[in-house]
Amino acid sequence: EIGVRLVGSEMCIRDRAVAFAQCAVQNGAEVVTDCRVTGFIKEADRITAVETSKGLIKAACVINAGGVYADGIARLAGDESFTIHPRRGEYILFDKTAAASLVKGVVFPTPNKKSKGILICTTTHGNTFIGPNAQDMENKEDTAVTLTGMDEIMNSARKLIPNLPMGASITEFAGLRAVSGSGDFVIGASPVAGLFNAAGMQSPGLTAAPAVAEMIVEAVLAYCPAAVKADFKAALPQNPLFHRLSHEEQAKLIEKNRLYGRVICRCETVTEAEIIAAIKAPCGAKTVDGVKRRTRAGMGRCQGGFCGPRVTQILARELGIPVPEVLKERADSHLFYEKNSADEGEA
């Protein structure tokens, strides 16, 4: 029997989400991205299909985990039982070496009605961040970073650790919390037959996610009974993380695959072999940000200034598309364009 007492742990939200998607794909699921829900098809007042920008998707039941748009998706189905408004949170991220000696875990202030407060936290990858603040918004697309927000975060963080090295920040960003009208999670069967909501997920949304999943599964099975998949594959292929290996282990890996010897992202020591593996994996990366989230190429101090063009070239080659078709993240987020013939000859 293990006698060590576990007092705490951290996990990477991004890695966890990617792993769940990869597990689903290797068990027969299909992931469709950049796909807008436009309506629902019903028969006898039960949902039978979803209308989308990429065609009709037949469905015995639909789980609505639409984030800040969950209320809009529910309304398309005829469910007006809840509303969602966005609450923006801004963050500042530091270089790995910046605050490593100052922070070893999570430093919390006293929580308030809106949030747990502006905190200081280390990540599983070694960075430190401060944030978030909490600003109620009208626009569900507004993830802008503001000077006022940055001042608020820095002043609050300095109350916890006065000598934070603010000059070592490498990027700022913002995200949106999905706040329900009731202020609570919206979980379970909708008044519309065949629709199940998992909405209004504020903190502690990640911590609650496994329990929320069990609640949704229970509700779905009560509506649409199904057997457990007998040949379910839970284990995912494990690719080596080059930067975590010893020099001897790295040398052996390069002998097997020379692309491990080509470091594309020097800030995070990410190799071409790792990037290719991320592209070819189940639910593989299709964009520059997709590669970044899976491998950390572009997450270092230069924020992709060095490796960004090289990652783009690798994506184009592996996906069999021209460089101008490689996206940063969403539709129309092109990084490169074909030279206009009208520009020929210009200085």
How should these model regions be labeled?
Residues 32, 63, 196-198:
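Hydrophobic/aromatic beta-strand patches that form the interior of the parallel beta-sheet core
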Residues 40-131, 135-145, 155, 164, ...:
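Flavin-dependent oxidoreductases
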Residues 12, 265-267, 302, 307:
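Short cysteine clusters
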Residues 292-309, 325-347:
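Short Fe-S-cluster ligation motifs
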Residues 10-61:
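Helical element adjacent to the flavin cofactor pocket in flavoenzyme catalytic cores
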Residues 1-8, 12-13:
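Single conserved hydrophobic/aromatic residue that forms the stacking wall/gate
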Residues 19, 115, 124-125, 136-263, ...:
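C-terminal catalytic lobe of FAD-dependent flavoproteins
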Residues 141, 271-282, 305-323:
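Iron-sulfur (Fe-S) cluster-binding segments and ferredoxin-like electron-carrier domains
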